Amino acid sequence: MVAFFLPGPRRDPRIRRTARQGMGFLVQHLLIMGSSRILKRNQEMAMNKCSVLLNRAREFEPSRANGGYILSTSSYPQIRQYAASPDEHLRSLPSLLPPPPGQELPLAYLRAQRQSSGNYRGIQAQRRPLIDQTGALQSSFPESICLKEELQSLSMPRNSPNAGRNLVGHPHSSSKSSSKPCHFHFFRGYCKKGVNCQFFHGSVPELHNPRQVHPFASLSKLDMEIRELLIGIPPPVAVDRLPSMYFEKYGKPLRPDGWLTESQQHGRTGCSLTSLLMGLNTIRVVEREHGQYHVVLVEDARKKYMDCLGLAHSCNLMDTGTGSNQIYMTFPVHSKFTDDDVENYFKQFGPVSGVRIPYQEKRMFGFVSFLYTETVRLILSKGTAHFICGLRVLVKRYMEKSELRMTWLKSVSGSQVDSCLKVTIGHTIAKAPSKKKKEVKEQCSKDQGPIKIYRKNKQFDYREHRTSGFGVTNEHYIGNNMKKKSHRSDDLDEASAYEDSDEIILPDSLGLY
């Protein structure tokens, strides 16, 4: 039988070339998918091996298995060998003590180098020489993704302070990582951006550099470093800027021992950064407008900031009034301490220039003078009660008579006074409350002398009135000018009464101040 094949339409060679190219793309896609599946399978196998090894290690040393030291210091073939080895072999491994408090891992001078290769090679077991603090070589570990994820998921819980770090203790940061410290992390204790924050979240233990790890044994060195930092900078410097400036100058964060952020103080021992700065000797914390805290040097604070700024060098930020370098103290009658005891007690707040306790049979008060006004402010910020030689001593700021007058004028000024009476002291006129007017009446009635306080719509009397305590002279009041008459006899004080303005000039002896 003969078969005849009819010639069909001729195929275009371009179609054959396109089909050949499509097959090539399909093969490449299958190869990529196969390699990704192989990579995923290898990672799952590696994670399973790590899980098996960790679970077996937990049975022997539960408290030391979470550190992941075996995983971090062993290569992947060693991990597979450990996972398949019997229990006797695991028990024969050297028992490792937990790392000291200053270190999270016993690794120093280690730098994580990530591989930025475009192809997929699976798990790469590259070895890195590790040197501990004693100079001895340690084994290396592979920088595989599975080990990091295994340590993060199994060994380090989320609430652990080491969570979110890789094996060498560095935080997982993006390519935009900066050396500037994060404001929220340093002052609030947390950052809402977490590991994606572009600023520095590090603390002292995670730097792993002896030149950067600097726990402050005392505040003296911190005081000296901050003083050197502030010298040459125009004052004042905001407290918020201080951590970043400190890190730029010294290359280490401002995190001394015992320091906690504001959010970490509840139920824990420590102090805030502002309270820490208040404990230093060569700098002062001042409060400016809008409640902002700034730091200045002591000499700058004495020159220009002590009078115009509120001194915040105390936790309760008490306002102690105007500047005065003396305090007035009262104490029990049976007190037996001497002037030297008083001086030695107040020397802890600042230099003392003198102590004066009047000699009396029953002494109950005294005066202490200081070289600087801020010393008085600091003493009063601690409270009014102090104990010298076991005896309770009450202190308050010493005020001159002129200051007492101005204080009383400020206290009676405003809307809480009665406008029916005015008291004139020198060239200052201030409104006095009706209570003071009542005291004037009682004082005059005790002396049993005539007194007239003239009211409006009454006949004006030009006669002079006398009392046993003081003399009263009538005067005219015309516009804004006051025409004053003075009368003085037998060393008596003087006072004047006015019909139109109801103004009375009262003597100092009435105790209005």
Swiss-Prot record:
<keyword id="KW-0694">RNA-binding</keyword>
<keyword id="KW-0238">DNA-binding</keyword>
<dbReference type="InterPro" id="IPR000504">
    <property type="entry name" value="RRM_dom"/>
</dbReference>
<keyword id="KW-0862">Zinc</keyword>
<feature type="domain" description="RRM">
    <location>
        <begin position="325"/>
        <end position="411"/>
    </location>
</feature>
<dbReference type="Pfam" id="PF00076">
    <property type="entry name" value="RRM_1"/>
</dbReference>
<keyword id="KW-0863">Zinc-finger</keyword>
<dbReference type="GO" id="GO:0003723">
    <property type="term" value="F:RNA binding"/>
</dbReference>
<dbReference type="InterPro" id="IPR025605">
    <property type="entry name" value="OST-HTH/LOTUS_dom"/>
</dbReference>
<keyword id="KW-0479">Metal-binding</keyword>
<dbReference type="InterPro" id="IPR012677">
    <property type="entry name" value="Nucleotide-bd_a/b_plait_sf"/>
</dbReference>
<dbReference type="InterPro" id="IPR035979">
    <property type="entry name" value="RBD_domain_sf"/>
</dbReference>
<dbReference type="GO" id="GO:0003677">
    <property type="term" value="F:DNA binding"/>
</dbReference>
<dbReference type="GO" id="GO:0008270">
    <property type="term" value="F:zinc ion binding"/>
</dbReference>
<feature type="region of interest" description="Disordered">
    <location>
        <begin position="155"/>
        <end position="180"/>
    </location>
</feature>
<feature type="zinc finger region" description="C3H1-type">
    <location>
        <begin position="176"/>
        <end position="204"/>
    </location>
</feature>
<protein>
    <recommendedName>
        <fullName>Putative zinc finger CCCH domain-containing protein 51</fullName>
    </recommendedName>
</protein>
<feature type="compositionally biased region" description="Low complexity">
    <location>
        <begin position="170"/>
        <end position="180"/>
    </location>
</feature>
<feature type="domain" description="HTH OST-type">
    <location>
        <begin position="218"/>
        <end position="299"/>
    </location>
</feature>
<dbReference type="InterPro" id="IPR000571">
    <property type="entry name" value="Znf_CCCH"/>
</dbReference>
